[in-house]
């Protein structure tokens, strides 16, 4: 059986022209990077809900996030899980950082490849509570589009009017990296000239924390939050849940060079 090969007429170079971050260390790339260089940790005791009955009581959560700072109105915010809001905020920063001009003429050559490992746990828990308390009529009509993983990529395209490929691959903890790779391949094979890529997560909820605790995956080093994440250490005892988003703008080199990106 012969191996199938896809012909690429001319190998296209790909560059990063924009970066956006929403992390436990900062609400933008600059603050996050400065904190990393200073050796700071974003892992702290969980204050989002009562964790007294959980073996793991720490996480790396985003702090002081305000959706309105990223042109997400309260009305729209009620339609989106936090992972969508984090990712959209990071995309706003990345696209601004890239100084990307989006027009009717180029919108079909600009796409999105952004995913989430788990998706909308907070939204799922909230609507399950509504169901239990008031029956199915109390469930938000925006529950499904506000919780499923592909809607972050969808919301980015909606915000900017992007008409290129729209991808949302889910591969657990490698989701962000996987989408970056697929976005790059999309440009390489000529299906787009620009791709907004990355991942977003918000899994620090009772269900998320409880689920990972049940499979004994999390560190219980609650008294040493900043020292809990140590994957290659002999004394490691699990990982730490982390929330936030990281978005890149990938661009075909000649295009980026032409516009002095």
Task: Provide a role label for each language-model segment.
Residues 28-31, 35, 83-90, 175, ...:
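Generic hydrophobic secondary-structure packing signal
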Residues 48-101, 149-163:
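A glycine- and small-residue-enriched flexible loop/hinge segment at structural boundaries
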Residues 2-57, 61-70:
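Generic N-terminal targeting/processing segments that precede catalytic cores or assembly contacts
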Residues 2-11, 27, 38-46, 77, ...:
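Acyl-thioester C-C bond-transforming condensing/cleaving domain
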Residues 21, 80, 169:
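Generic anion/oxyanion-binding catalytic loop in active/binding sites
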């Amino acid at each position: 059986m012969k191996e199938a090969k896809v012909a690429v007429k001319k190998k296209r170079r790909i560059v990063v022209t924009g970066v956006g971050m929403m992390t436990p260390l900062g609400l933008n790339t600059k603050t996050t990077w400065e904190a990393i260089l200073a050796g700071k940790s974003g892992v702290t005791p969980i204050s989002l809900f009562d964790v007294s009955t959980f073996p793991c009581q720490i996480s790396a959560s985003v702090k002081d996030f305000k959706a309105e700072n990223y042109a997400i109105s309260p009305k729209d915010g009620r339609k989106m899980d936090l992972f969508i809001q984090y990712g959209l905020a990071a995309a706003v920063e990345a696209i601004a950082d890239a100084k990307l001009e989006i027009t009717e003429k180029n919108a079909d050559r600009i796409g999105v490849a952004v995913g989430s490992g788990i998706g909308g746990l907070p939204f799922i828990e909230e609507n399950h509570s509504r169901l239990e308390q008031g029956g199915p009529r109390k469930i938000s009509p925006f529950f499904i589009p506000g919780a499923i993983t592909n809607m972050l990529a969808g919301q980015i395209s909606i915000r900017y009017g992007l008409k290129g490929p729209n991808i949302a691959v889910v591969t657990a903890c490698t989701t962000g990296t996987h989408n970056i790779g697929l976005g790059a391949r999309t440009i390489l094979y000529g299906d787009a000239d620009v791709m907004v890529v990355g991942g977003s997560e918000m899994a620090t909820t009772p269900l998320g924390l409880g689920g990972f605790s049940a499979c004994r995956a999390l560190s219980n080093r609650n008294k040493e939050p900043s020292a809990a994440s140590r994957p290659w250490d002999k004394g490691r005892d699990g990982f730490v849940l982390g929330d936030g988003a990281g978005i890149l703008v990938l661009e075909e080199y000649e295009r980026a060079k032409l516009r002095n990106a």
